[in-house]
Structures are given as C-alpha cells and as structure tokens.
A protein has these predicted regions:
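Buried hydrophobic packing segments
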Residues: 30, 52, 97-98, 203-206, ...
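Residue-level signature of catalytic and energy-coupling elements of molecular machines
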Residues: 19, 71, 184, 258, ...
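Short, glycine-/Ser/Thr-/acidic-enriched flexible segments
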Residues: 58, 72-73, 167-171, 193-195, ...
Length: 362
C-alpha cells in the first residue's frame, strides 16, 4: 500500500538540496581573498546587489573605450574535480578573460565570477575563489563581485563550472589591432606554461581516461619527472600585467594574439588585416626556435596528431604572439625581458589573405 506525503509537512529550500547556511559560510570564507584585489576605484564591498567602480580615473584619457570579455575554463575543470585540486582553476579563469582584452591594449579594471556547483562546499569554493583572487592580483584588476549557484538535481554533487567576466579600458588612439600591421613586421612569441586551458577534451580522452588518481600522480620520464596531474593542471600564464607595463614603458607593439582554443592557426590570424599572412617558422625536423612544453608533445603523441593538427589544437608553447616593426624588435624584446618575459622570434608578416601559414624549412 502506498501512502502520500504529509500535506502539512514543511518542505524547506534545504530539503530541495540548496544549503543557504553553507552559502553564507562560503561567502565568509572568500572575503579575505577578495579584499586583497581591491583598487582605489572600488566603491563599497561584497554584499550589495551591484558592484560600484569609479570612472573618475578615465578623465585623463582622450577618448576612453571600455573593453569587455567573458570566458570559462572548459573541461580542464573535470580533471581538477577528479584530482580534488581546486586552487588553480580560478587563476585559469582570470587568465582566459584578461588576456583576451589585453590584445586591444586594454587594462583590466574589474572582474566578476560565476560559480555553479552541484552541492555547495565552502572549503572548495574558497579554494576556487582564492585562485580567482590570485589571478586578479597578477593582472591588476579588482574582483568586485560574483555569483555562487547551487544546482541540486541538475549537476552531480562534486561537479562545478566557472565563468568569468572582465571589463577594461583603453584610450581610443592607443587601441592595438590588425589595422596597424604591415608587411615585413616580425612576430614575437611569449612562452606558455603548458597546455593552459584549451584542448582538454582531447587531453582527457587520450591521457586521463582509464587512469587512476594514483597513476596520474606518478612522475613520468616523458615529462621530465613531473606527474601528468601536475603538468595538466599547471595554471595558465597571465600576460596582461607585464604586457601593459611594457606598453606603458613605450614598447611599440602593433597587435597581439592570445593563443587559446584553435591554437596558433586559429588565433594569430585574428591579429591580421585581410591582405597579409603570418608566416610562422616551425623549423622542419629540427623543430621551432622555441620550446614546446613536454606535456603538449606527450598528449600529441598519444593522440597521433599530425603537426598541422597540433598547431590548430594546442598553443605549442606560445601563449601570446606580438606583432612589431622589424626595426623595433630588439627594443621591444628588451622591454619585455624587463617584465620577466622571454620573447622569441617566431615568424614574419607577408602578403596574403589574412591567414597563418607555416615555413617548415630546416
């Protein structure tokens, strides 16, 4: 015999799977980290319905232009969840956003995050937001607000997803981009720290699936003694702070390309006008003039990827590409070195149709 539920029994939000008290604990756990990212323009603190940021500093610009961006971390999060390591994916989130607006020459001003979880756990959220705060400190933007959403019945309890939103500013006469690029310009690359935050569906398929956590934490000779877990979760390099400092120091950079999903092939072309190509020197059998991170080679070999497919999937060791006048290469390289970067020449600009081509000569 079946019985119906007591129609007089109270069913709370907690009964439905949403823990308001845990949400309050999570907010308390992140306040200190968020406070470390503040800027003078921030008005008020956490807890308001909206976040206020003074525009007074923009008065010194000739024509201030706001630049916005949004992104996520993708399926790299599934590996973080598998390994129960949550302290670096927030840094990835910030990197993916701020380094998408710096190619216009924009300074990131403030950042907001969206954290969706199956079941809210204050400690895990604190780790995630701690990473976001670290990324904001590195890029110089303020973490002014965000949203934590608990999705019981929609997401598994241990699952979460992240989205980030950044707003920056650039003076209109100083906007960088394809219209400044000319034939004969040189392409400089800045090293990546590894896979960064793109290509992880392939990484998981060929290098992660079927392995235990213990196996993933074992040192591998192919990775120079590093474990696969450490290699694939290494945080994405944040270039914004150093590049903006270089621009303020007078580095005459014409255009930039953030090398993310689609690799060099599908990103460097975004810095080109329609009548020019970017010729990248892959160096033939000897390989390029820069270092390809071992983890990228490891995954590419596991997937039997052709060279062309590698260059349209992974960053291949280039996290950011810059286009500069041939006569300015040495000066720009020196300024970049002063900011801690190790720039290298990776190609040149030639007549074409707005695409990336490869020179594979030895």
């Amino acid at each position: 015999m079946t019985t119906s539920a007591d129609p007089t029994k109270q069913i709370t939000y907690a009964d439905a799977g949403v823990d308001v008290d845990e949400g309050a604990r999570a907010v308390d756990a992140i306040k200190a980290a968020v406070a470390t990212t503040t800027r003078p323009e921030v008005i008020g603190g956490l807890g308001g319905f909206g976040s206020c940021f003074s525009a007074a500093a923009l008065k010194d610009m000739e024509e201030p232009v706001l630049v916005s961006g949004t992104d996520g971390v993708g399926t790299k999060l599934a590996i973080a969840q598998l390994l129960n390591r949550h302290n670096t994916v927030g840094e990835d989130l910030v990197a993916m956003c701020v380094d998408d607006i710096v190619p216009m020459g924009a300074e990131p001003l403030f950042f907001l995050d969206y954290v969706a979880v199956g079941k809210l756990k204050a400690e895990a959220v604190a780790e995630i937001v701690g990473g976001i705060a670290e990324g904001c400190r590195k890029s110089g933007c303020a973490l002014v607000g965000g949203e934590m959403a608990e999705h019981p019945g929609v997401m598994n309890p241990d699952d979460y997803d992240l989205a980030g939103f950044v707003v920056g500013v650039v003076d209109k006469p100083k906007i960088l981009g394809p219209e400044k690029v000319s034939e004969g310009d040189v392409i400089l690359g800045l090293p990546s720290s590894g896979i960064h935050s793109n290509g992880y569906s392939l990484v998981r398929k060929v290098a992660i699936e079927g392995k235990t956590v213990e196996e993933l934490n074992q040192p591998l000779e192919e990775l120079g003694g590093e474990s696969l877990a450490d290699a694939v979760l290494r945080p994405t390099t944040i270039y914004a702070g150093g590049l903006l400092a270089a621009l303020r120091a007078g580095a005459p950079i014409k255009a930039m390309a953030h090398i993310t999903g689609g690799g060099i092939t599908e990103n460097l072309n975004r810095a080109l006008p329609a009548h020019l190509d970017a010729e990248v020197d892959r160096g033939g059998e000897a390989g390029p003039a820069w270092d390809i991170p071992p983890v990228i080679s490891y995954v590419s070999n596991a997937a039997n990827l052709s060279l062309d497919e590698q260059y349209r999937t992974f960053n291949m060791g280039v996290g950011m590409a810059l286009i500069v006048d041939m006569d300015d290469v040495d000066d720009v390289a020196e300024v970049l070195s002063d900011q801690g970067f190790e720039p290298f020449v990776m190609g040149q600009i030639i007549p074409g149709t707005g695409k990336v081509v490869y020179n594979d000569a030895n």
